[in-house]
Amino acid sequence: FDMSEYQEQHTTARLLGAPPGYLGHDEGGQLTEAVRRRPYSVVLFDEIEKAHPDIQNILLQILEDGQLTDAMGRKADFRNTIVLLTSNLGARFLAGQSAPLGFAAGSEAVFEKQSAQAIEEAKKWFRPELVGRLDELIVFRPLAEDSLCAIAEKLLGQLEARAARNGYQLTHTPRVGAVLAARARSPYGARELRRQVDRAVE
């Protein structure tokens, strides 16, 4: 679930379903229906910091009780799901590092310190009772140069395939991917790389 779509309080109801008397009441909730149909699932809440604070109440129910009751009174069992929350909270502590962080000699201690700062930042945002129910908080390293190059190659390959479907032939050298990756250095992942492909190539 892209949590940027659940920023308003009324949008949180979509996860559990509309209450009786409202449009879409008979459809059930997006989250509860998905788990009811596939109880052995990985449920990803992407960029959780963008969600309305009421989402934390839903997460507390999932993590405490292992189930949610939708607007129609049906229970969705989460005991066999893996729930992941992703966030950019604390990413500013990893910003400004030269690539590839963690691979140069002596940078492990620096990364550990930055990870601790990022985790503290996340703990300030989440309610304490929710943090207490999380199994683990993990900080991912910024993408290394070779990873960004591989992603650039994939994006360029997708662009070439789209062009071929429209009757055009595009080719590129490996250097193009490396240049795009160098331009796209960002502590926030590969989104900037997609923008570079859009701007510079498309």
Provide a role label for each language-model segment:
Residues 1-202:
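AAA+ P-loop NTPase nucleotide-binding core of proteostasis motors
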